[in-house]
């Protein structure tokens, strides 16, 4: 039977400090017994010295030095079952939808099993999100980790929900599931997420974890690990293709900073812990495809850049670990364009692995490159027009200036419930490219122009 210690020496913020007489494991779960018989759970953060540091999930309010501490010898585990699908849970895995507790097939350590790098397969299959700026120009590939860089006041939550509703792997026989984890959200946002999932029917194939802003910061650190453990279970035990959406990683990083300050750690850049890069990697690197497994785990972490600063440590470090970024732009949002995704600073490093003949369409890469080039030139010309006026532009420059407006209005802009197939996206791309003279389509092979250009199709 586990011993009960009454050796709490200090209580600081969400942490308690306990003297130990026996070895205690890192990440071990702790039960804290209060005077009225109430039991709270905690987790060991540091056991390297004679004093054990324990973070308390429910907060330390009401605790005193006379409380009993029991080290369980177990790590935090997720009750894993296929019954997770269709459920809305708290950040620590407790039911938030009024339903019964999950009856587990397995109890899985939320820190995940180590993935052998040699067993990883390169991502190569296209995932259709139904959003043209992602599918057409910054394609998401199965097994990839592709973050969305947003900022406060921008509609990243709406984009996340739209992807959760619409995402699919065209032509795949395996089932598709979404694991959605929200961290540090308000009650209003939680109600919005819950009602959207239930109203649209997306909940049937989803597992939702919601950690509220007034929940303990400690739970915020647990939430993404709960979500990723659920995703790995569905992918590797049930052969499903799982898309994990984590929002907002900034709130997660703030919780890390708060915990570091409570432990009197030496801070790194802008007060964040020096190990934040490593910690974020333990989340992002759980995406992938494993040799011999039918399923896969794909990640879309969403983070709001403090002060719209892409060089802030959170987006900066995330960019080193992940495989590209989708950038949500305030400028496009001010124009009333949804989704306000700016394709120029956006990038999917694995895009070329997931597009082309047999995956999307043979002309996909060429159309994407040509739209990028045309839009970039049009944006540059807007700066020139602001100085010299439109009258100074040549006919060619005027065409590119108009193309930039067309690109934003026809290609970028789409409805919040508009689910475009990859064929729809490429067709819109070709329609707006007709505004440019054919001799300016230098990035598209002539055989694709003859086959797909609307002017040539009409002629046939």
Swiss-Prot record:
UniProt main location, coarse: membrane
One GO CC annotation: plasma membrane
Alphabetic keyword roster: ATP synthesis, Cell membrane, Hydrogen ion transport, Ion transport, Membrane, Transport
Gene3D superfamilies xref list: 3.40.50.12240
Entry's Gene Ontology molecular function annotations: ATP binding; proton-transporting ATP synthase activity, rotational mechanism
Any GO BP annotation: proton motive force-driven plasma membrane ATP synthesis
Family: Belongs to the ATPase alpha/beta chains family.
Misc. remarks from the entry: This organism has both a Na(+)-translocating F1F0 ATP synthase and this H(+)-translocating A1A0 ATP synthase.
Entry protein name: A-type ATP synthase subunit B
Provenance organism: Methanosarcina mazei (strain ATCC BAA-159 / DSM 3647 / Goe1 / Go1 / JCM 11833 / OCM 88)
Gene: atpB
